[in-house]
């Protein structure tokens, strides 16, 4: 895994979460669009950099199938990291009392959002790789 990609995915994940939670507050009647995240989420989102080497193995799969694979992987990562953070007493999310939750750590109804997020990370990582390749060809990297 490339550290540059880890850092960029961590930042992109934070941004996606802030936008997502902002829309959530708006849907609950708060027009201020207040979004939030946690510092704990940075390394979790940073792990999306693992999509880069995985993509090379599955790039010929249909787009939606790749998205479902990413979403399943993300939800597994969410469950494992959430379980560890809960054990340490610092888990920033708790889905207990919401529909379709698993142990209050994962929400199955978020699967479509994770499909989109996984594919967004794939596109971001492809862009970064192509940009680096183009700069290298020009002798700028």
Name each model feature, range by range.
Residues 1-141:
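Aromatic-rich, lipid-facing transmembrane alpha helices and their immediate juxtamembrane interface loops
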């Amino acid at each position: 895994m490339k550290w540059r990609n880890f850092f960029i995915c961590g930042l992109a994940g934070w941004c996606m979460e802030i936008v997502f939670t902002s829309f959530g507050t708006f849907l609950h009647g708060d027009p201020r669009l207040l979004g939030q995240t946690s510092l704990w989420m940075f390394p979790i989102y940073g792990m999306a950099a693992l999509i880069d080497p995985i993509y090379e193995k599955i790039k010929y799969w249909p787009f939606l199938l790749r998205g479902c694979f990413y979403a399943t992987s993300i939800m597994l990562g969410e469950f494992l990291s959430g379980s560890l953070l809960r054990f340490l007493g610092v888990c920033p999310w708790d889905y207990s009392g919401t529909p379709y939750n698993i142990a209050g750590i994962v929400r199955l109804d978020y699967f479509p959002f994770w499909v989109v997020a996984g594919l967004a990370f794939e596109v971001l990582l492809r862009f970064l790789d192509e940009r680096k390749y183009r700069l290298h060809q020009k002798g700028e990297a």
